[in-house]
């Protein structure tokens, strides 16, 4: 029955005349207020949306949105980790402005989001699935690792990444929770279609294509398993899956080496292992696309597609073994470049917009669609002027209202320094900590899209220019110092709360395999760090 539903959804859009779709999406709705559906995936590499159709993985519904809406070619996360990135999207503010430092410290539970604002202005609202923008979530291990990242020890904190196959060629529902939430969302859309008098905003958060938990890691397991079924894996032309180039371990930037080690990626991998991880990840992206398709199909079936804005994006990307890492927590393209597609009323089809944008821009965009006044003190800019700027299928020029730079920051686990990225005209500048204690990196994406050559030492004048601009946006040495103080305070509070059981608890976190080789030495390293005045 599930297989039949998927096939029916695909049939609807392969059989629906293209001119009918274009006409439906361009007509002004009778109700001046349009609906909005936002689908936010987790860990979706935005570069996949830039590829030719079916080149690496079959993504029919993303391609449908590309054809009938707008694709942002340069969309970036404001923090390559779950909770802070989502806090930026919901608040419209850079993470340092809300002190969203890690997966445990984000927005307060009563923080007014853009959805709260549109609800007060007459919209019916619904949030379903993964939201993950409030403080207090994620595992104990995750937060302790984030707090202690400045301690000078090196411990593996993640399971070794692996690829697992489940089910058979007819199994479509691998991520059961996502499918359950999509079923709830489609039922909600069907019910909303019966009420034509009140517009709605629907948010749906997916878990896919985030790696699955690795329960073999013990009590405090992380997520390092790329899991899919043969049904989705057949959507990936295996011969097209590439093996990324790696620098020798001894040549890696020190923060990259720390990340590779803590992510359990410094041991040898066979080409087969790497290719499987990447292929399975792409298959997980195909399943996420199928979930998006259920939402688009529901809007089409209920006659709401023509008066609904559909947004597809992600909190961050996935490295999938690029730069000898998996997961995110990095400013490399696989981790920081996110998908962003928008289609809906009055959006010209087939647009490819080159202006660099980020998640904070969705806050004012949602408010503008809702006809609500946009606050002046936010970090983002509405994307609506860009979306209505061009009526042809060529790349739309940059609009002066929106700056042509993006900023991202990271303060969580699996990286041993606060990290800041400035993207400006295809230059990517990455600064760390206080700007002096850790060397920066600079990449020319126009000639080095794989980011294998750090040219910071070759063009010092460009480094100086980019660093000056970054400091005009964020006083990053001051922010790094604040995070350092926060980490110490929170760790001390947690240690006091654990009491006499501290030694046992800290030894059994995700790093337990390494920790238990020299437990006393690691405890002493933490004690020395707590007492130090150095602000890294």
UniProtKB/Swiss-Prot annotation:
Domain of life from the UniProt record: Eukaryota
InterPro entries recorded: Alkaline_phosphatase_core_sf, ARSK, GAG-degrading_sulfatase, Sulfatase_N
Chief location bin: secreted
Subcellular location: Secreted; Lysosome
Cofactors that this protein relies on: Ca(2+)
Chain residues that bind substrate: 130, 253
One GO term describing the cellular component: lysosome
GO MF annotation, one: arylsulfatase activity
Positions where 3-oxoalanine (Cys) occurs in the chain: 82
Catalytic residues of the enzyme: 82
Function: Catalyzes the hydrolysis of pseudosubstrates such as p-nitrocatechol sulfate and p-nitrophenyl sulfate. Catalyzes the hydrolysis of the 2-sulfate groups of the 2-O-sulfo-D-glucuronate residues of chondroitin sulfate, heparin and heparitin sulfate. Acts selectively on 2-sulfoglucuronate and lacks activity against 2-sulfoiduronate.
Record family assignment: Belongs to the sulfatase family.
Protein name: Arylsulfatase K
Organism: Xenopus laevis
Name of the gene encoding the protein in the UniProt record: arsk
């Amino acid at each position: 029955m599930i297989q039949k539903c998927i096939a029916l959804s695909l049939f609807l859009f392969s059989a629906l005349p293209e001119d009918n779709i274009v006409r439906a999406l361009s007509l002004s709705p009778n109700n001046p207020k349009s609906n909005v559906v936002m689908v936010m995936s987790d860990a979706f590499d935005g570069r996949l949306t830039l590829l030719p159709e079916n080149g690496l993985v079959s993504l029919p519904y993303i391609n449908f949105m590309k054809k009938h809406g707008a694709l942002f070619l340069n969309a970036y996360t404001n923090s390559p980790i779950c909770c802070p990135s989502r806090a930026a999207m919901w608040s419209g503010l850079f993470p340092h402005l809300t002190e969203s430092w890690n997966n445990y410290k984000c927005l307060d539970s009563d923080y007014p989001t853009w959805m709260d604002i549109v609800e007060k202005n007459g919209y019916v609202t619904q949030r379903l699935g993964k939201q993950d923008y409030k403080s207090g979530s994620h595992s104990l291990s995750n937060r302790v690792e984030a707090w202690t990242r400045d301690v000078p020890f090196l411990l593996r904190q993640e399971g070794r990444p692996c690829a697992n196959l489940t089910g058979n060629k007819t199994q479509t529902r691998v991520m059961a929770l996502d499918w359950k939430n999509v079923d709830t969302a489609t039922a909600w859309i069907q019910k909303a279609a019966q009420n034509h008098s009140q517009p709605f905003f629907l948010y749906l958060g997916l878990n896919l294509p985030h790696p699955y938990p690795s329960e073999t890691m013990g009590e405090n397991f992380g997520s390092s398993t790329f899991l899919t079924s043969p049904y989705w894996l057949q959507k990936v032309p295996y011969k097209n899956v590439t093996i990324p180039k790696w620098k020798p371990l001894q040549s890696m930037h020190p923060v990259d080496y720390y990340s590779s080690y803590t992510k359990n990626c410094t041991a040898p991998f066979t080409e087969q292992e790497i290719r499987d991880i990447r292929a399975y990840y792409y298959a997980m992206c195909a399943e996420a696309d199928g979930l998006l398709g259920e939402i688009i199909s529901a809007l089409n079936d209920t006659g709401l597609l023509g008066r609904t804005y559909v947004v597809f994006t992600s909190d961050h990307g996935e490295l999938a073994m690029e730069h000898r890492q998996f997961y995110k927590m990095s400013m490399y393209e696989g981790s920081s470049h996110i998908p962003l597609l928008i289609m809906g009323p009055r959006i010209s089809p087939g647009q490819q917009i080159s202006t660099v944008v980020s998640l904070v821009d969705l806050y004012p965009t949602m408010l503008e669609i809702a006809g609500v006044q946009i606050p002046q003190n936010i970090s983002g800019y509405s994307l609506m002027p860009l979306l209505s700027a061009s009526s042809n299928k060529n790349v739309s020029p940059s609009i002066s209202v929106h700056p042509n730079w993006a900023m991202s920051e990271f303060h969580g686990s699996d990286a041993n320094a606060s990290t800041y990225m400035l993207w400006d005209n295809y230059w990517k500048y990455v600064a760390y900590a206080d700007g002096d204690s850790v060397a920066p990196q600079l990449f020319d994406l126009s000639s080095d899209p794989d980011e294998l050559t750090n040219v910071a030492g070759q063009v010092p004048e460009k480094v100086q220019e980019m660093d000056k601009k970054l400091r005009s946006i964020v006083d990053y040495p001051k922010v790094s110092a604040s995070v350092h103080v926060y980490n110490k305070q929170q760790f001390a509070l947690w240690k006091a709360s654990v009491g006499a059981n501290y030694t046992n608890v800290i030894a059994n976190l995700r790093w337990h395999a390494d920790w238990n080789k020299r437990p006393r030495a690691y405890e002493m390293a933490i004690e020395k760090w707590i007492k130090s005045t150095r602000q890294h």
